[in-house]
């Protein structure tokens, strides 16, 4: 039974922070997958450098001991080794820099014609969302507030201090534009599984794009210190199928907006 549970939690996607977690959450977007791949590539080069430098250090300590070489050699110049130690690190830096720059510039790209635009507004200390592509019967955009569920009132299976009363529902495999701003102080809209962290600045509109590739529930938090309850501003993005998303919009968001 224990082995079965271990296999389940090991193979299941990790879309929320876990106790003693050291690695990344599982990627839900191509952007996050690129970040993870870049991290692994850089880590590979770091291991090579660590092994090489450690080998040189151990070799120097072993061979150049004062008992073995009481009279040290005086070497003031070595053209070959100087060329190697200049060219070799430059090649490594090129292998690291080229994919990192490509990923960095792709983060700034915004989809020209997104299928859905969602506006996320930060408040002290909750969030409000606006689906500007849909209008209710009274010609109002679909809006709702999202508050954290108190830590003393979670339901079975909910994450402590990460669950909200109203989730952001998005369709999977669809280009989505997120417009981020703030109504009071600096906030941030960050969801690690999607590889997105966008600052919410009062009086300014920042935007980012996401393409969630699989259905699931993704958790995030405010990543900008914004006051006393900074830790109580979670973000929950629920990615569903396009068919389910359409029914959610018609059955939940529109009635909710009408009541507001």
From Swiss-Prot:
User: EC number(s) for this protein?
Assistant: 7.1.1.9
Q: Which organism is it from?
A: Beta vulgaris (Sugar beet)
Give me the residues that bind Cu cation A2, please.
222, 224, 226, 230
User: Per its UniProt record, what InterPro entries does this chain match?
Assistant: CcO_II (IPR045187), CcO_II-like_C (IPR002429), CcO_II_C (IPR034210), Copper_CuA (IPR001505), Cupredoxin (IPR008972), Cyt_c_oxidase_su2 (IPR014222), Cyt_c_oxidase_su2_TM_dom (IPR011759), Cyt_c_oxidase_su2_TM_sf (IPR036257)
Q: How does it assemble?
A: Component of the cytochrome c oxidase (complex IV, CIV), a multisubunit enzyme composed of a catalytic core of 3 subunits and several supernumerary subunits. The complex exists as a monomer or a dimer and forms supercomplexes (SCs) in the inner mitochondrial membrane with ubiquinol-cytochrome c oxidoreductase (cytochrome b-c1 complex, complex III, CIII).
Q: What is the lineage of its organism?
A: Eukaryota, Viridiplantae, Streptophyta, Embryophyta, Tracheophyta
* Role according to the record: Component of the cytochrome c oxidase, the last enzyme in the mitochondrial electron transport chain which drives oxidative phosphorylation. The respiratory chain contains 3 multisubunit complexes succinate dehydrogenase (complex II, CII), ubiquinol-cytochrome c oxidoreductase (cytochrome b-c1 complex, complex III, CIII) and cytochrome c oxidase (complex IV, CIV), that cooperate to transfer electrons derived from NADH and succinate to molecular oxygen, creating an electrochemical gradient over the inner membrane that drives transmembrane transport and the ATP synthase.
Keyword annotations of the record: Copper, Electron transport, Magnesium, Membrane, Metal-binding, Mitochondrion, Mitochondrion inner membrane, Respiratory chain, Translocase, Transmembrane, Transmembrane helix, Transport
Question: How many cofactor units bind, and how?
Answer: Binds a dinuclear copper A center per subunit.
The name under which this protein is listed is Cytochrome c oxidase subunit 2
């Amino acid at each position: 039974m224990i082995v079965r549970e271990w296999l389940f939690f090991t193979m299941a996607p990790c879309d929320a922070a876990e106790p003693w977690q050291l690695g990344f959450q599982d990627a839900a977007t191509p952007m996050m997958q690129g970040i993870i791949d870049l991290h692994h590539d850089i880590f590979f080069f770091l291991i090579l450098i660590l092994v090489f430098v450690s080998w040189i250090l151990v070799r120097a300590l072993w061979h150049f001991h004062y008992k073995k070489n009481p009279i040290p050699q005086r070497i003031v110049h070595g053209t070959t080794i100087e060329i190697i130690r200049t060219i070799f690190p430059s090649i490594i830096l090129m292998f690291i820099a080229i994919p990192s720059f490509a990923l960095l510039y792709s983060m700034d790209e915004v989809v020209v014609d997104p299928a859905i635009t969602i506006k996320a507004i930060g408040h002290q200390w909750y969030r409000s969302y606006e689906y500007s592509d849909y209008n209710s019967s009274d010609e109002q955009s679909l809006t709702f507030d999202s508050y954290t569920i108190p830590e003393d009132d979670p339901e079975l299976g909910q994450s402590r201090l990460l669950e909200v009363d109203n989730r952001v529902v998005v369709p999977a495999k669809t280009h989505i534009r997120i417009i981020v701003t703030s109504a009071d102080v600096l906030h941030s809209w960050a969801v690690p599984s999607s590889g997105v962290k966008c600052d919410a600045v009062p009086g300014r509109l920042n935007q980012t794009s996401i393409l969630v590739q699989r259905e699931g529930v993704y958790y995030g938090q405010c990543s900008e210190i914004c006051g006393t309850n900074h830790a109580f501003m979670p973000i929950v993005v629920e990615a569903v199928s396009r068919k389910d998303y359409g029914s959610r919009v018609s059955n939940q968001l529109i009635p909710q907006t009408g009541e507001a």
